[in-house]
């Protein structure tokens, strides 16, 4: 397969088979590939929000320390190759094609089992990390934790649990304690756990899992993380003995994501050559697209992948912090299986205009239906829907013409199209 064929192959698998939780098929698939994951040590990351950003911070720190580090995140936002990072760069198109070919052949040889697209993408990550000789690799769980395809690994040296809130409730449960129990499934004996402060109902299963695994739990409390300065270029954060951490990633959630990475690096420094300078430099150099990503101009444009109530709430905080009382224009698309009514309630109270779009996803909510839901809650708000094939692009044209800051949000799936529009219109 070449790169395009590899992409098309995985998309075909995705269209034929959806989410299936469980580890048996993944174990069988990896056995066919001679278990490359056993050659690498892992840092597992689970949580509802902040996984990718935390993984990005920690990747940067470990890279500064000279450690050969890999990172696997999902879903892809701007490119299929961005999910796979090792030793300073993302996977090349030729490596991607070679890896997918190997995984597809292994999948085809299984007796009566068809691995999902996510399982095969995860297998590609394991294959790639082994090929590149990674010393450590950071694994972001795709859904939950305990029964997620990433959780077949047995060489975990550290587990990180980010902010937990209500999402994927039909699969993970309708109580925060149930969701947290799934996330806590990544905890392994002998691998220290770093966890951001959670609601008590969420902390209980995490503490229980750490105790059962007889492994230390390091809790990062939000009142230990102090943002002392913030503008459109950076924020300055104090976390315990780490003073004046410079964050180039914007947004109200980033200080706690950075603190999790700092705490993880501090724990890992007992076994790896990580110094304070590596932590400071790594934090400052971290970039992660689609997370309160600011493009300054006339007007400013923010790209944010917030897609659940907690993420939307943090987005609102960030918008208020940056723009104050300035009217905001939103370009929004959502997936129909999300709690969009609560997201509407949280976000649009101070909007000047909302332009709704239909995301490029089989799970998409139609832009007209989203408009109706917004008007039901905010009858006086000006809402315009764009239904055409180029609706996302038309919505952006309409939004920037208002000359107010533009916030693009609701789902990660619309961000690639928006960024392509920005590139074509000299706004990047």
PLM segments and residue spans:
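Glycine/aspartate-rich loop-and-adjacent alpha/beta segment that forms the canonical ThDP
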Residues: 412-428
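ATP-dependent carboxylate-amine ligase catalytic core
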Residues: 28-38, 64-154, 172, 200-201
